[in-house]
Amino acid sequence: MLNLTLTFLVVALIAAFLGFSGIAASAAAIAKILFCIFIVCFILVWPNKTGLVPVQEYPGRSCLHL
């Protein structure tokens, strides 16, 4: 998602450099929205740094010993 944000930011900068102010404003607005969504997702995932922990059906046993 951060890649999309950076892509729209680059598009906005190029469009602004070439004089397309409407396209630059739209791309900058999209980049801003995507960045905010990215930050919210990052804050929600950050406390759980390790990600999802797999659940074992039979603790201490592997599938081969059933």
UniProtKB/Swiss-Prot annotation:
A GO CC term assigned to this protein in UniProt: plasma membrane
Any single Pfam family the record assigns to this protein: DUF1328
Entries under InterPro entries matching the protein: DUF1328
Localization of this protein: Cell membrane
Membrane topology note: Multi-pass membrane protein
Signal sequence region: none
Keywords assigned by UniProt, alphabetized: Cell membrane, Membrane, Transmembrane, Transmembrane helix
Record bears the keyword Transmembrane: yes
Domain of life, per lineage: Bacteria
TM spans (from-to): 4-24, 28-47
Transmembrane found in the keyword field: yes
NCBIfam families in the cross-refs: PRK13682.1-4
Family of this protein: Belongs to the UPF0391 family.
HAMAP family registered for this protein in UniProt: UPF0391
Name of the protein described by the UniProt record: UPF0391 membrane protein AM1_5042
Organism per entry: Acaryochloris marina (strain MBIC 11017)
